[in-house]
């Protein structure tokens, strides 16, 4: 199985809208994430025009579109990026596709674009995503208790981070 990530293109819009609206994907995505065609188009266009500060990437498995993930700059001076919007189509789940895709995005952001820190936040009820973050090398850094209103219920946000030196140590580079 070959997994690769690539920057999303306008030709990916139908796939992205369908994936982000899928009944098995949508409940786990942050409310602020664009799902409508115009919002997704704006994100893809921004990713293409601001590649160092904003990105939407398509995950492919053996050449087939399988998912999406993204980043945006959180702090330019300190070189911090927020990661988010990871979604894998249910047909590709259970194969650790997201783990390999996350590693590729980490290497791109840290070694190619020069970010120092990558961070993400996951809903407390999303145990699958938390396990993925830990498998992908992220360190659990804390919990924002009852931080988000999801359909009238307060849920926690679990914070994860990865530093350049974490990835360098893993890769065996100084």
Locate the predicted segments by residue.
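Glycine-rich acetyl-CoA-binding "A-motif" of GNAT/NAT acetyltransferases
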Residues: 64-67, 128, 154
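Conserved GNAT acetyl-CoA-binding A-motif
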Residues: 111-121
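Conserved acetyl-CoA-binding loop-helix of GNAT-fold acetyltransferases
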Residues: 88, 94-108, 127-135
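Extreme N-terminal starter segment of soluble prokaryotic enzymes
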Residues: 2-4
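Acetyl-CoA-dependent GNAT
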Residues: 7-11, 21-93, 108, 113, ...
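C-terminal "cap" of GNAT-fold acetyltransferases
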Residues: 146-174
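Structural motif
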Residues: 113, 135-136
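Conserved catalytic-core motifs of GNAT/GCN5-like acyltransferases
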Residues: 119-122, 139-155
């Amino acid at each position: 199985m070959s997994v690769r990530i690539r920057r999303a293109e306008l030709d990916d819009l139908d796939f992205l809208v369908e994936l982000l609206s899928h009944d098995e994907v949508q409940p786990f995505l942050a409310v602020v994430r664009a799902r409508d065609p115009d919002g997704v188009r704006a994100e893809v266009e921004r990713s293409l025009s601001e590649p160092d500060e904003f990105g939407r990437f398509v995950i492919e498995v053996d050449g087939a579109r399988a998912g999406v993930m993204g980043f945006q700059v959180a702090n330019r001076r300190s070189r911090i990026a927020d990661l988010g919007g990871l979604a894998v189509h249910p047909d590709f789940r259970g194969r650790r596709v997201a783990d390999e895709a996350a590693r590729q995005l980490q290497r791109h952001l840290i070694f190619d674009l020069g970010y120092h820190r990558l961070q993400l936040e996951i809903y407390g009820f999303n145990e699958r995503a938390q396990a993925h973050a830990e498998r992908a090398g992220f360190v659990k850094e804390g919990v924002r208790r009852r931080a988000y209103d999801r359909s009238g219920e307060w849920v926690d946000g679990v914070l994860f981070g990865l530093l350049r030196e974490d990835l360098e140590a893993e890769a065996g580079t100084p």
